[in-house]
């Protein structure tokens, strides 16, 4: 894959993720957009690691750590959302102010 194509793909994914985080009112959609942002960061890490320093795999190793963090977020996030849904009967972000109660 050409260097510029990978950066453009990463920029598109990151932009879609940021737009989704800003405009979403649903917690599940916000979690999906956060995953898009993390995947865009991984593409950047692997691309720059391959292009600038192909002998040392620092970017690839760091992207594995980001994938592990994303997996933990993917496991814990829906559990938190389902807990909030059980208590509030809604997954809308503006209705889930837990500090009010």
Swiss-Prot record:
Signal peptide: none annotated. GO terms for biological process: ATP synthesis coupled electron transport; photosynthesis, light reaction. The chain crosses the membrane at residues 2-22, 32-52, 61-81. Keywords: Chloroplast, Membrane, NAD, NADP, Plastid, Plastoquinone, Quinone, Thylakoid, Translocase, Transmembrane, Transmembrane helix, Transport. InterPro entries: NADH_UbQ_OxRdtase_chain4L/K, NUOK/Mnh_C1-like. Belongs to the complex I subunit 4L family. One of its GO terms (molecular function) is quinone binding. The gene is ndhE. Pfam families: Oxidored_q2. It is an enzyme of class 7 (translocase). NDH shuttles electrons from NAD(P)H:plastoquinone, via FMN and iron-sulfur (Fe-S) centers, to quinones in the photosynthetic chain and possibly in a chloroplast respiratory chain. The immediate electron acceptor for the enzyme in this species is believed to be plastoquinone. Couples the redox reaction to proton translocation, and thus conserves the redox energy in a proton gradient. Its EC number is 7.1.1.-. It is a multi-pass membrane protein. This is NAD(P)H-quinone oxidoreductase subunit 4L, chloroplastic. NDH is composed of at least 16 different subunits, 5 of which are encoded in the nucleus. It catalyses: a plastoquinone + NADH + (n+1) H(+)(in) = a plastoquinol + NAD(+) + n H(+)(out); a plastoquinone + NADPH + (n+1) H(+)(in) = a plastoquinol + NADP(+) + n H(+)(out). It is found in: Plastid, Chloroplast thylakoid membrane. GO terms for cellular component: chloroplast thylakoid membrane; NADH dehydrogenase complex. Its main location: plastid.
């Amino acid at each position: 894959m050409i260097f510029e194509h990978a950066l453009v793909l990463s920029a598109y994914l990151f932009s879609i993720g940021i737009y989704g985080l800003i405009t979403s009112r649903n917690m599940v959609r916000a979690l999906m957009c956060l995953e898009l942002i993390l995947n865009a960061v991984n593409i950047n890490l692997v691309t720059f690691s391959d292009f600038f320093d192909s002998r040392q795999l620092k970017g690839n190793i760091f992207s594995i750590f980001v994938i592990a963090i994303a997996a933990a977020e993917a496991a814990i996030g829906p559990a938190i959302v389902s807990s909030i849904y059980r208590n509030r009967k809604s997954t809308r972000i503006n209705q889930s102010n837990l500090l009010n109660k």
